[in-house]
Amino acid sequence: IRFPGLISAFTLPSGGTSDYGPEMLHAAAQDKPYACFVREDTKISFMAMPDAIKSLLMLVDVPREKLNHQIYNIAAFAITAGEFRDRAVKAFPGAQISFAPNPRRQGIVDSWPEDVDDALARTEWNWKPDYDVDKFFDNYFLPEIRKRYGK
């Protein structure tokens, strides 16, 4: 399985190239300023960790003879860094988020697709994420961030 950027509500981001979104929310919840290392219009695919686990469990249950491919892309939602910022500001009014692109890291992200085609996984083993962008923020990520920081 080829995963998009995986986000867990229960672990802290660890400085990965796709961690700018979660880093924004953690900073906003702590009333800390955050300078995002990619451009505001940067868009890539993300997925909630429970959906990543679900995909692995689904795939392992498919009889081998029913699979026509060796590699499957899976996707959940694609969002820009600016949209992450907007969600952070909406959830934590007064959040101080700016954009200060790092050329090296921006170059890495620019080499990735904005979204991925997971049609093979959807067709061959009925892949479908539980978390779209709204459910990810409203039902998974933000409740845990608020709980972690007492907000």
Q: What positions do the PLM features span?
A:
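C-terminal substrate-binding subdomain of Rossmann-fold SDR/epimerase-dehydratase oxidoreductases
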Residues: 37-39, 45-151
